[in-house]
Amino acid sequence: MPRVLAIETSCDETAVAVVTADVAWPGFAPRQLSSVVASQIDLHAAYGGVVPEVASRQHVETLPFVLEAALQQAGLEVAEVDAIAVTCAPGLVGSLLVGLMGAKTLALLYDKPLIGVHHLEGHLFSGFLAEPDLRPPCLCLLVSGGHTSLIWMKDYGDYQTVGRTRDDAAGEAFDKVARLLGLGYPGGPQIDRWAQQGDPQRFPLPEGKVEHPYDTSFSGLKTAVLRLVQQLQQQGRELPIADIAASFQACLTHVLTEKAVACAEALGLSTLLLTGGVAANRELRARLREAARQKGLRVVIPPLALCTDNAAMIGAAGLCHWLRGEVSPLELGVASRMPLEGIPSLYMDGGGAHREEQTGSAAL
């Protein structure tokens, strides 16, 4: 069975995994032999958000230990894997460089193919780790701190973004509202926790209207919460934090659910995949399951450990590319931004355009 060692350092998690597949290509059923994640949440909480310089330095310190733990968990040596996969875009440049340099070092030392992986494609592949019988085509609702997108997965490696946020990503909106309510960082889990005790109908909030049927906009919702908080404070009233959190969460998750289900129906797709850090939200998971059930759609929601950033999803995507004969040049660089349509440039079969001179040097 093929085995890929994967590294993920795009933001504030240092992660390493070993992934294999039970079914030979073109069938694809990946599974993880190991997955180790070292989170920096507590480190960044004091700053109210991720500090790029702090994140990259922490990756440098942590990566060797996480790598060793993942290999021990899998019962393997680096020499026994078939390829090295690594997140190279999008993300924090300094953090990405740490992972890429580590991956290049291993690829050169052990003479292994290097496979650069787009972080968002990794999130798509978390669904295949969760349910091995999942096959494209399907529609993915990807919701995280930096991205909110509806992605039509037509086939392995063939993606079309059919809906996106016009401003704040869902996770960003959660963080900003949590900050307004004094709930701390990260905001998503805090809002989710408080909302369980609140009345979601107490404060009607705007859903945000955009012309495109599947795009979203959360800046208006965030501003409405700000004005509500200011109004209550001016009146000298105690903030009903649970009710505000519940009202905000209900509004945001309703928008995401309605657009995802409508888009899947319009495209004639029978399967919906929910992934990304915000997929851990209990209200969103419940709403999407119920809405999909009413429409006769299948819903795939990975376990929480696969929704947040991890290296297993990067390994699954990397393994898919390796099975397709796609490998990256050692001149591979990193990029803070890259659309899914840029994925072919990561591989030599795609022209190998994603080189150090275009994205910042990461060559050894």
Swiss-Prot record:
Keywords: Acyltransferase, Cytoplasm, Iron, Metal-binding, Transferase, tRNA processing. Fe cation binds at H119, H123, D309. GO terms for cellular component: cytoplasm. Its main location: cytoplasm. It catalyses: L-threonylcarbamoyladenylate + adenosine(37) in tRNA = N(6)-L-threonylcarbamoyladenosine(37) in tRNA + AMP + H(+). It is found in: Cytoplasm. Binds 1 Fe(2+) ion per subunit. One of its GO terms (biological process) is tRNA threonylcarbamoyladenosine modification. Substrate binds at L142, V143, S144, G145, G146, D175, G188, D192, N281. CDD domains: ASKHA_NBD_TsaD_bac. The keyword Transferase applies. Its cofactor is Fe(2+). InterPro entries: ATPase_NBD, Gcp-like_dom, KAE1/TsaD, Peptidase_M22_CS, TsaD. One of its GO terms (molecular function) is N(6)-L-threonylcarbamoyladenine synthase activity. Its EC number is 2.3.1.234. It comes from the Bacteria. The keyword Acyltransferase applies. Coiled coil: none annotated. Gene3D superfamilies: 3.30.420.40. Required for the formation of a threonylcarbamoyl group on adenosine at position 37 (t(6)A37) in tRNAs that read codons beginning with adenine. Is involved in the transfer of the threonylcarbamoyl moiety of threonylcarbamoyl-AMP (TC-AMP) to the N6 group of A37, together with TsaE and TsaB. TsaD likely plays a direct catalytic role in this reaction. Belongs to the KAE1 / TsaD family. This is tRNA N6-adenosine threonylcarbamoyltransferase.
